[in-house]
Amino acid sequence: MGGMAKKKHEKGAGSTPATVQLEKAGVPFKTYEYAHSNDHMDDGYGVEAATKLGFDEHQVFKTLMADTGSERVVGVVPVSGHMDLKALAAAVGAKKAAMADPKVAMRESGYVVGGISPLGQRPHHKTVLDESALQYDEILLSGGKRGFSVGVNPNDLLKVLDAVAAPIGTW
């Protein structure tokens, strides 16, 4: 056992910067773990999570990082869709946005691709959640590593991230 005390949360849950941020904010959340494999990589990590955890793909969200030219911003959209970069730029008051290089996204977020969470990033980035999330009591997103998701109320997520909701998802 290490010298750091762990706060108690759902059985089997690992501690990541994402779960630490939720705990510190007092936000209720659930953790979901699944065996990550490379079999789903044509579909993406989020589709794998939805399939293995038995959730609708519209209720499971992926975290994508974009570059507006002056800053990096985070978009959180359903795994079943894509991110509208023009809409993301508009939501943060920028003229345009382009997808960040995966290596940049890993360095800027502190997470590996397939495990990037909008929570617990260092430094914090402006975050936009697709407004479709607001129809659910719980959405799933990466908990900070592959095979580990957190379930959280989208309104709680907006508050803890100081994020905005906007129509940034496309299907």
What does each model-identified segment do?
Residues 2-171:
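Extended, low-hydrophobicity, polar/charged segments
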